[in-house]
Amino acid sequence: AVNRGFGGDTLNTSVYIARQTDASALSVHYVTALGTDAFSQQMLDSWQQENVNTDLIQRMADRLPGLYYIETDDTGERTFYYWRNEAAAKFWLESDRAAAICEELATFDYLYLSGI
């Protein structure tokens, strides 16, 4: 059986922090870029249900999200397959909103960063 989920180091961290904090006391934002496709929308909807603020996520009509697939063998060993060379997240700094998003991030108390 194939199970679909959304994850990655920065998203997992954002979701875990959002789950452990009072949303009125701490706003957890996630910054990335996604496409305008239905799969990207499902990702956004899922993150919003976890109380992760998605206002700073850019949508790129000509891009799709990066994907990875994890295969687990009978002993529990995992093998990872990645498709992210053309992922929207790889290009978000080239967008028109990038400078404004960076300025807004400069006002945040804490940042957790990662990259591909």
Give the positions of each predicted feature.
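Short catalytic helix/loop segments, enriched in acidic residues and glycine
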Residues: V2-Y16
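Conserved N-terminal subdomain of the carbohydrate kinase-like
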Residues: A25-G115
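A short, Lys/Arg-enriched amphipathic alpha-helix followed by its capping loop at the start of a domain
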Residues: T13-L26
